[in-house]
């Protein structure tokens, strides 16, 4: 219900304090409603399966136990049910992530939203999709998740490359940052999906997959910091000159040195520069993918080069280069204390997570290890029970 409630409220926030194009607002709301309906359809399917056995529930833990064969042979979600339910759940959550081709609402929503709402969208809302895939889709439908793993890896890699190329093509500063989110969240899906089974049913390179899951979790948090920071820095200059045309910016480092320094630091975090938060999740996702497919890992790694291309190009056009030539040059004034405080806080966390990633990994290690062990056990310690229940 709370997931469903986020759909109209997201649209309300996007429309806050701005004259939103009605078509864009309807698109955002429609995408959110479609996301919710897919999730509800998937959960409804698995609940109906359990209903005749007195287990008609939406309790995530109980549904996960059934899906993982812990209730077999008396009750189990067979392969066909898990496949259909997983696809529905994944599509529903992927719209929120978002990954290609479910991303179309995101650039328009960010462009129309006020700066604080863009920061919330990037830092919190997108993570609801990733959390749902990890917390609900995989544990309840492990057979479907494993069967779709190759398709998910392809989708993650394509999102990385597509999002980067789309960002390169933008002239709107905020839309460029929005497309960068599509690329960065592709690493989340890549790290999560590199689940590879051997002929004996055991996970091949289990430690690599655990690394990928840890990377996916870390990347979601790191992206929440760097992307929120980039949107904030776009908003700071937009509030002064009221445009986002990259071709009309220039020389802001000289006009607003403190703002320029904070902005470059946060954009470097989004770039994935070593020592900043964006580097850890991306490099570990690529390392995990190397065990799954060396070719796909190389393609995913090339996304880092493309990311450097559009981030450095934006820095050169906005903060360096010739003098500012857009409207309202008289409004370009140094940032105030409130803006500086927000920028410093975000940059502090970007540096903290970059130089001391163990701060997060230590918190999540126990949960991610249990997550991987539980799903691996579906294909190792409990295959006979699942077969008896029609799971394979």
Please place each PLM-identified region on the residue numbering.
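Internal transmembrane alpha-helices of multipass membrane proteins
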Residues: 110, 123-124, 148-208
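Alpha-helical transmembrane segments and their helix-entry boundary regions
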Residues: 105, 118-120, 176-177, 212-216, ...
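Residue-level recognition of transmembrane alpha-helices
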Residues: 123, 177-181, 219-220, 263-266, ...
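Predominantly late transmembrane helices and immediately cytosolic-facing juxtamembrane segments
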Residues: 227-231, 296-331
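Alpha-helical transmembrane segments
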Residues: 79-92, 214-229, 295-308
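Membrane-interface alpha-helices at helix entry/exit sites of multi-pass transporters
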Residues: 113-123, 244-261, 297-303
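Small-residue-rich segments of transmembrane alpha-helices in multi-pass membrane proteins
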Residues: 1, 116-129, 181-194, 256-263
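Juxtamembrane/interfacial segments at transmembrane-helix boundaries in multi-pass membrane proteins
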Residues: 1-94, 98-101, 133-151, 194-214, ...
């Amino acid at each position: 219900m709370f997931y469903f409630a986020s759909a109209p409220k997201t649209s309300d926030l996007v429309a806050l304090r701005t004259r939103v194009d009605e078509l864009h607002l309807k698109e955002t709301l429609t995408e959110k409603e479609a996301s919710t309906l897919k999730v509800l359809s998937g959960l409804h399917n698995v609940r109906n399966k359990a209903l005749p056995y007195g287990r008609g529930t939406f309790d995530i833990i109980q549904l996960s136990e059934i899906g993982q064969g812990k209730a077999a042979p008396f009750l189990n979600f067979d392969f066909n049910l898990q496949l259909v339910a997983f696809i529905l759940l994944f599509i529903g959550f992927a719209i929120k992530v978002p990954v290609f081709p479910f991303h179309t609402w995101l650039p328009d929503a960010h462009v129309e939203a006020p700066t604080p709402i863009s920061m919330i969208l990037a830092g919190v809302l997108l993570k609801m999709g990733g959390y749902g895939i990890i917390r609900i889709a995989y544990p309840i439908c492990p057979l479907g998740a494993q069967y779709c793993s190759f398709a998910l890896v392809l989708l993650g890699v394509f999102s990385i490359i597509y999002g980067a190329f789309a960002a390169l093509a933008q002239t709107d500063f905020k839309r460029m940052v929005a497309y960068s989110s599509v690329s960065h969240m592709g690493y989340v899906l890549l790290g999560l999906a590199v689940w590879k089974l051997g002929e004996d049913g055991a996970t091949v390179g289990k430690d690599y997959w655990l690394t990928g899951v840890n990377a996916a979790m870390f990347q979601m948090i790191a992206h929440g910091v760097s992307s929120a920071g980039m949107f904030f820095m776009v908003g700071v200059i937009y509030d002064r000159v009221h445009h986002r045309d990259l071709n009309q910016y220039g020389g802001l480092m000289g006009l607003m040195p403190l703002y320029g320094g904070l902005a470059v630091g946060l954009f470097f975090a989004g770039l994935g520069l070593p020592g900043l938060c964006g580097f850890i999740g991306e490099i570990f996702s690529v390392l995990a993918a190397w065990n799954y497919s060396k070719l796909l890992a190389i393609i995913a790694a090339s996304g880092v080069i493309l990311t450097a291309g559009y981030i450095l190009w934006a820095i050169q056009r906005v903060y360096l280069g010739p003098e500012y030539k857009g409207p309202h040059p008289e409004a370009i004034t140094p940032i105030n204390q409130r803006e500086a405080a927000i920028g410093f806080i975000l940059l502090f966390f970007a540096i903290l997570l970059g130089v001391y990633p163990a701060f997060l990994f230590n918190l999540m290690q126990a949960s991610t290890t249990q997550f991987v062990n539980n799903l691996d056990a579906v294909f190792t310690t409990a295959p006979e029970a699942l077969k008896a229940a029609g799971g394979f």
